[in-house]
Amino acid sequence: MVTQKIYIELKAFDHCLLDGSARNIILIARRSGAKVNGPVFFPRRIAKFIVNRSTHVDKKSREQFEIRTHKRLISLPKANSAILQALMSLQLPAGVDVKVKVVGG
């Protein structure tokens, strides 16, 4: 049985959805017997957009929008293929972007 280090990076606009997904991943990994480090909270990225309200005049009247991207990192230092298969079968919400990086093995 080959052990590997697995990094799971989660991104979402909704932090409640992101925290619930991280909790589910940690729960499944611990049930499988893996040691879990995290979730590590990364600084949120805020993208701001400012547009004119009218189509061609009145520059003083503007609308402001922002998108907040939240990130979490979960690492499994000694994971085997059974844990990886359990994580791959996990159903996560549509608003969560998942990147899995496997190192070693």
From Swiss-Prot:
Keywords: Ribonucleoprotein, Ribosomal protein. GO terms for molecular function: structural constituent of ribosome; tRNA binding. Transmembrane segments: none annotated. The keyword Ribonucleoprotein applies. It comes from the Bacteria. Part of the 30S ribosomal subunit. Involved in the binding of tRNA to the ribosomes. This is Small ribosomal subunit protein uS10. It comes from Anaplasma marginale (strain Florida). The gene is rpsJ.
